[in-house]
């Protein structure tokens, strides 16, 4: 072991990792999965969801694996009874206050941890109508779990637009534009990076929203094709999601070395021309026939 590496134990496994490696990174390096919600590989951890907490022998409180650096010689438990009970409670509280029906990942976690939110009052659940202010994406705040990822992507983590932020505090906290002005009047540049990191579909492509409303959204039938954006020379990788031979949304892989999953408005939304009717000029024969008439 060099001075730059440290050793610790995770779920009984000896692990050696570089110093400053987070517990989450160390666990995943040996195949141990820790659930996350507010964490993303292309964003800085903000420790707000508490879903990734684990038990460390050098801490009385459970610690967030996404941001807590490994300590040499420490013993980490990622799925004991205390940790499991805490994650179950977090999932139940989230489900009692939000519509998580469109998050396949959270639905799977609810099932895996046997979370049952019915023991909490359903009066906490919000039932707001989606905000539809343009043809690009919608905002459904009754699905928002305040993970903060959209605010990060809009701010200094990617776009540096700062069009949205967390407004108010406590039960009244929500994602909002400045002074709650309509999105088209805000500083938003419609890059859609907020949609790309949203884990619950609180921010959703308008195309997906329309197809879901028509009961025609079929992710199991969709194909994903990688290509390079042709609008400029940066070389962003695009993932074209197609259904019934039509593009329904565009994403970008978070591990892409050029943009880390972030795109501009052209890359994310400038694809409708692909499906526009193609103009076919009349042939010489058709033109001659028109003249004769």
Say what each PLM segment does.
Residues 243-293:
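Cofactor-/ligand-binding subdomain signature composed of acidic, glycine-rich
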Residues 221-254:
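Catalytic and ligand-binding motifs that coordinate phosphates/metal ions
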Residues 2-11:
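Eukaryote-biased recognition of intrinsically disordered, low-complexity regulatory segments
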Residues 14, 163, 237-239:
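Short, surface-exposed charged micro-motifs
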Residues 12-72, 82-86:
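N-terminal cofactor/phosphate-binding cores enriched in small/glycine residues
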Residues 50-54, 59-190, 195-196, 201-228:
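Fe-S ferredoxin-like electron-transfer domains
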């Amino acid at each position: 072991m060099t001075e730059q590496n440290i050793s610790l134990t995770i779920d009984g496994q000896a692990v050696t990792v570089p110093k400053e490696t987070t517990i989450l990174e160390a666990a995943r390096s040996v195949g141990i999965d820790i659930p996350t919600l507010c964490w993303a590989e292309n964003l800085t951890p903000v420790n707000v969801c508490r879903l990734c907490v684990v038990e460390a022998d050098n801490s009385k409180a459970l610690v967030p694996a996404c941001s807590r650096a490994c300590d040499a010689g420490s013993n980490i438990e990622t799925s004991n009874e205390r940790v499991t009970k805490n994650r179950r409670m977090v999932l139940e509280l989230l489900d009692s206050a939000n519509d998580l029906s469109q998050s396949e990942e959270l639905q799977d976690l609810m099932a895996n941890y046997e979370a049952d939110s019915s023991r909490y009052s359903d009066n906490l659940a919000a039932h707001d109508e989606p905000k539809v202010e343009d043809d690009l994406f919608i905002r459904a705040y009754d699905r928002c779990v305040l993970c903060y990822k959209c605010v990060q992507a809009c701010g200094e983590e990617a776009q540096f637009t700062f069009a949205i932020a967390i407004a108010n505090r406590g039960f009244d906290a929500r994602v909002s534009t400045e002074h709650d002005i309509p999105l088209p009047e805000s500083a938003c540049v419609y890059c859609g990076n907020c949609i790309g990191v949203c884990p619950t579909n609180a921010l959703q492509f308008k195309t997906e929203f329309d197809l879901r409303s028509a009961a025609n959204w079929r992710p199991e039938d969709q194909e994903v094709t990688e290509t390079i954006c042709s609008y400029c020379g940066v070389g962003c990788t695009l993932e074209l999601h197609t259904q019934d031979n039509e593009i329904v949304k565009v994403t970008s892989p978070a591990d892409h070395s050029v943009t880390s999953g972030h795109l501009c408005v052209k890359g994310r939304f400038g694809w409708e021309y692909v499906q526009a009717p193609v103009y076919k000029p009349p042939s010489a024969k058709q033109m001659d026939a028109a003249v004769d008439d």
